Amino acid sequence: MDSDSPILPLSNNPPAARTHDHSQRNNHARHVSSSGTTLFAPVKPATKKYNYRRVSPHGSYISPLEAMTVKLADTYSICNPKFQFSSEQNPRRPLTKPSEGVHNHGFDNVNHDYVLYVNDLLGTDEGRKYLILDTLGHGTFGQVARCQDLKTQQIVAIKVIKNKPAFYNQCVMEVSILELLNNKYDPEDKRHLIRLYDQFMHKNHLCLVFELLSINLYELIKQNQFRGLHLSLVRSFATQLLSCTSLLKQARIIHCDLKPENILLQDLSSPIVKVIDFGSACHERQTVYTYIQSRFYRSPEVILGLHYNCGIDMWSLGCILAELFLGLPLFPGNSEYNQLCRIVDMLGNPPTWMLEMGKNSKKYYNSGFVNGRKTYELKSIEQFSIENNKTEQPGKQYFGEKTLDAIVLNYPRRKTTPKLTPEEHEERLCFIDFIKQFLELNPLKRWTPDQAKNHPFITGASFSQYCIDKQKPLLTTQRTRNRSHTIGNQAVVPPSLQRASTYVSNEPEEFVHTRPLPQYYPPANENENVDEFF
């Protein structure tokens, strides 16, 4: 400190002479008042306070730390009045990998994805410009970015499609289906469907603007450490998803890819969900694709190569509801053959008419005649591996029990905890009966959404009385057929289900519709089946 710096007095009296007694000075200035009392004041330099020094844009003084960080541009403009800051001059961080421009005049990378940058803009028309904030995910179709509408300041999700004709054409179908559903069938946004706000072209990429939602149900299960959710929460999700699938059936639209990843929470404060990703959806009268649905949720008629309808979404929904309660997929097949094996092990063989008409039946089944009746037997893993020139793996078993009843009634595996109360036992029996209607192998007998809405699991009615009214036993014992079990031929073959005539897939099965499973089971906390997220 400068030795000539003045001392700030605490009174109107002149300051006393300086003392050289360092033991009493202690970095303070000593003053004597008129009454003879000695006073001390902090030593402060008298500096000229410029009006513009450390001043925020609103005129108040700010700390040096704030001035040199968040207010750095303002500080520099004070030092150099000619300096003008623009956010467009900020370094742009790439969000797309790889980020090197290869195609489309350098705008696209080697995978034909548009290279996204933070603070870059999507859209060029006035009133249709979106500031890129971050990335939300990517897939075979392209990328999803978190953006801000510069006109309304609303935060949205924008799906940027790859610059390839096949993806463009498929997304045009997605747009037409969503506009039909949003505008005609659900204009009031009450049926749990994602809302499409806008679509436009940007640098030869189709961009779809959606409402921004929260995490998906798979992430919810993962955050719950793969422990099942409480049945009351499963019931809430089931009610909403039945409302959605009922609307889809009314519009004769098949989603074709229902799974936990495509069901998102609206926000983290409530259990309201919405169904997303209609990129694989189609009209019931235009079912040209046969390689559809994610494997864990793929219906038997799709595996066998039969014609399909909205019933395949109900099969997927049954698998999803079981997974929400159990914490793990009910049929986690590691291949399509293994997927079929898991289904047959738990539910038995499909009806003979399905095996007779399935385009892929010969791939999975041996056929023959016993006493003049045609029979079918699922091929062994050894035979299937030899015939298809690949090594099939049996797949890990995540449940100790094999029947659906036993899996649900005994989950979680209890060691020291008491048995289920009668009320809990009946509630689980009700849930078992409910999802069995979704997991009906025969698509002609599988329940529709409107039928499922009237089940006691949804309505809350007495399940015991329901069983009496339906003349069914309260405690059902599900029979599990052996995979080599033969089924007698049926006389009537439903004409509405015909062989699918087209196979469209340009990607190997192992690269799509897969998801890693946790390496452990049962989960760490095996004595509780509660949801800790809400």
UniProtKB/Swiss-Prot annotation:
Matching InterPro entries: Kinase-like_dom_sf (IPR011009), Prot_kinase_dom (IPR000719), Protein_kinase_ATP_BS (IPR017441), Ser/Thr_kinase_AS (IPR008271), Ser_Thr_dual-spec_kinase (IPR050494)
Phosphoserine: modified positions: S33, S56, S60
A GO cellular component annotation in the UniProt record: mitotic spindle pole body
Record: active site: D257 (proton acceptor)
Modification sites for Phosphotyrosine: Y291
Statement: the UniProt record of this protein carries the keyword Cytoplasm: yes
Record field: catalytic activity: L-seryl-[protein] + ATP = O-phospho-L-seryl-[protein] + ADP + H(+); L-threonyl-[protein] + ATP = O-phospho-L-threonyl-[protein] + ADP + H(+)
Localisation per UniProt entry: Cytoplasm; Cytoplasm, Cytoskeleton, Microtubule organizing center, Spindle pole body
Alphabetically ordered keywords of this record: ATP-binding, Cytoplasm, Cytoskeleton, Kinase, Nucleotide-binding, Phosphoprotein, Serine/threonine-protein kinase, Transferase
Gene3D superfamilies: Phosphorylase Kinase, domain 1 (3.30.200.20), Transferase(Phosphotransferase) domain 1 (1.10.510.10)
GO molecular function annotations of the record: ATP binding; protein serine kinase activity; protein serine/threonine kinase activity; protein tyrosine kinase activity
Region (Disordered): 1-40, 85-104
PROSITE patterns, per database record: PROTEIN_KINASE_ATP (PS00107), PROTEIN_KINASE_DOM (PS50011), PROTEIN_KINASE_ST (PS00108)
SMART domains noted in UniProt: S_TKc
UniProt enzyme class: transferase
UniProt record similarity statement: Belongs to the protein kinase superfamily. Ser/Thr protein kinase family.
Protein name from the UniProt record: Serine/threonine-protein kinase ppk15
Gene: ppk15
